[in-house]
Amino acid sequence: MKKAKLIFKDNTPFSLDFDDFYFNSKDGLNESKFVYTHSFEWKNQENFIIAESGFGIGLNFFLTLKRLLETTPSKRPKKLFYISVEAFYIEKEQLREIYQKLEFYEEFKELLEQFLKFYPKAKEGIYRFYFEDCFLDLVFEDIAVLKELDFKADVWYLDGFSPNKNLQMFDENLIFEVARLSKKNTQICTFSSASFLQKNLKKYGFRVEKTKGFRKREMIKAYLENELEFKDKEAYFSRTFSSLKNKKVAIIGAGISSAVLAYELSLRGFEIDVFEKYLELGKGASGNESGILSSLILKPKVNLGEFSELSFIEASRFYRQILDLEFKGVVEFAHNDLMQERFDTQRENVLFKISKNQAFLEEGGVIFPKNLVKNLFEKSKACIYFNHEFQAYKFKNECFTLKFKNDIVKSDYAVLIYAMGADTKDFVFYDEMKLSKVRGQVTHLKPFLDTPFPLSSKAYICPVKDDLQVIGASYDRLNASLESKEEDDKQNIENIAEFIDKNTKLEIIGSKVGFRSYSSDRFMIVGNAYDEVFYKEEYKALLWTKNKEQKPAKMSCNLYFNFAHGSRGFSTSVLAARYLCALINNEPLCLEKKYIHAIHPARFLIRKLKKGL
């Protein structure tokens, strides 16, 4: 992404890209309060959403967060969602220097340093920060990304330099998206009073009021009079807002996708029950002694590769923010010509430090799955029911009743979520959803290689832990046995031959078998269960009507899916959990539209219908 070109004038940051100050050079703090952060009233509601065009140095955000935390809880929302779009990246040290030169540093030190600790690299994406009672989604993209987003803001901060120097931030296309992402009575806050901005706001249904600006300036405020109606050509992928009878959630399965989801739900005040068929945690694929956090490396502009990268970096940031984990990196090796070609095309990618046939991923590293899952469940305060093998559910009076083996029944859940990994194949029977259950075996060896970070090629090697070194993993679609196979251990050892001397004697001390869940297109399957009969009837003519407005989708009660994470569940589970929470709790969707379409449970059916099949 583009990096901001800035200098200091009178200790105030000045943009060379826009030939303008980032804010009022004389009294920027008070102007920001007057125009933006103190110009609206909080609402005592579940979620309050502020959207901003132009994050800049983050001053509006920190002022808003301070105001939130200083307000009596009964007079403010329970959770603030702050979504800010920024196209010009400012380096971490530059941000700290700006606050120091402005003499704001001490006032914002605690919040600023928390922010800088998890500040991402200069790469496009949506990055979430966890603050007390607040989620910040920092969107590193051009402002045109708004057309890819889905939320309904309570307040908009239209910031971004003088309109005559940054027309795109105030033009008709932007204001249309602002209106689309607003609801009735959404307030627009802006320092500008430009006539063309007023004209664009009025065109899309805003009531515009001129008011006294900061000091002698004039500014406007605007309020959306009625929510905008627009034609949705892809309504089959659009969200349906949920209505819950209570805040009880049942999750089937106790692996990593369940653990991250339970934690995220707990931040929203849900009561969570988790049902696991085994007698303890760690019996499935999420229970290995060691594993690696890494990313696929595909060619640029490949959706699967870009999604893998975003999943990886957000998982790394999540584990660091929530569990205080530290990562030393992971080395990926190109072990064939195709992989080398991919590596060669990614040399400019800031996530991958590529040298010859090696890529060093600084944000990756070794993970300890059993401990990680256990810690997340403990933080979530979820109640885990072991030895509960799920069989079926009934949905009546807006609640689920669950039936388990041995005639065990649990009831009164407003939401049910399938997160049972490879076992999902036995419970989901959509015609077009093809699921695979793939066996994987890791091998436990006596320590043989001293490495501070994992090495990944045909197979991977983890650093030593507790006098044990894990390598793996096999890949078998045909074998469903839980018993370890000697030939799989042999294959795992053969696949790490490039890392060891041929005379090295390896001692096998154990192995573990798990099963991965895969979709036919390698994307995870996450979202609301859909009404297959409705989809087949309503969208049967998509071959001829795909460019026309579509009828809103019909979903199947409050049943949600969270599976098909393949071998990278410790990466993808974080974005999956956030997205599901957004659907369940009517929050801003934290993914761009292209990714929502890629993981939607109905995507396989829609592809077929578009072909007229």
Swiss-Prot record:
The keyword S-adenosyl-L-methionine is assigned to this record: yes
Subcellular location per the Swiss-Prot or TrEMBL entry: Cytoplasm
Transmembrane stretches, start-end: none
GO biological process: methylation; tRNA processing
Positions of region (FAD-dependent cmnm(5)s(2)U34 oxidoreductase): 252-613
Sorted UniProt keywords: Cytoplasm, FAD, Flavoprotein, Methyltransferase, Multifunctional enzyme, Oxidoreductase, S-adenosyl-L-methionine, Transferase, tRNA processing
InterPro entries tied to this protein: FAD-dep_OxRdtase (IPR006076), FAD/NAD-bd_sf (IPR036188), MnmC-like_methylTransf (IPR008471), SAM-dependent_MTases_sf (IPR029063), tRNA_MAMT_biosynth_bifunc_MnmC (IPR023032), tRNA_MNMC2 (IPR047785), tRNA_S-uridine_synth_MnmC_C (IPR017610)
Major site of localization recorded for this protein: cytoplasm
Catalytic activity, as annotated: 5-aminomethyl-2-thiouridine(34) in tRNA + S-adenosyl-L-methionine = 5-methylaminomethyl-2-thiouridine(34) in tRNA + S-adenosyl-L-homocysteine + H(+)
Spans annotated as tRNA (mnm(5)s(2)U34)-methyltransferase: 1-225
A GO term for molecular function: tRNA (5-methylaminomethyl-2-thiouridylate)(34)-methyltransferase activity
A GO-annotated cellular component: cytoplasm
Gene3D superfamilies assigned to the protein according to its UniProt record, in alphabetical order: D-Amino Acid Oxidase, subunit A, domain 2, FAD/NAD(P)-binding domain, Vaccinia Virus protein VP39
Cofactor: FAD
EC assignment: 2.1.1.61, 1.5.-.-
Free-text function comment from the UniProt entry: Catalyzes the last two steps in the biosynthesis of 5-methylaminomethyl-2-thiouridine (mnm(5)s(2)U) at the wobble position (U34) in tRNA. Catalyzes the FAD-dependent demodification of cmnm(5)s(2)U34 to nm(5)s(2)U34, followed by the transfer of a methyl group from S-adenosyl-L-methionine to nm(5)s(2)U34, to form mnm(5)s(2)U34.
Family per similarity comment: In the N-terminal section; belongs to the methyltransferase superfamily. tRNA (mnm(5)s(2)U34)-methyltransferase family.
PANTHER family: SARCOSINE DEHYDROGENASE-RELATED, TRNA 5-METHYLAMINOMETHYL-2-THIOURIDINE BIOSYNTHESIS BIFUNCTIONAL PROTEIN MNMC
NCBIfam families (alphabetical): MnmC_Cterm (TIGR03197), PRK01747.1-2 (NF002481), tRNA_MNMC2 (NF033855)
Name of the protein in question: tRNA 5-methylaminomethyl-2-thiouridine biosynthesis bifunctional protein MnmC
Source organism per UniProt: Campylobacter jejuni (strain RM1221)
Phylogenetic lineage: Bacteria, Pseudomonadati, Campylobacterota, Epsilonproteobacteria, Campylobacterales
Gene name for this UniProt entry: mnmC
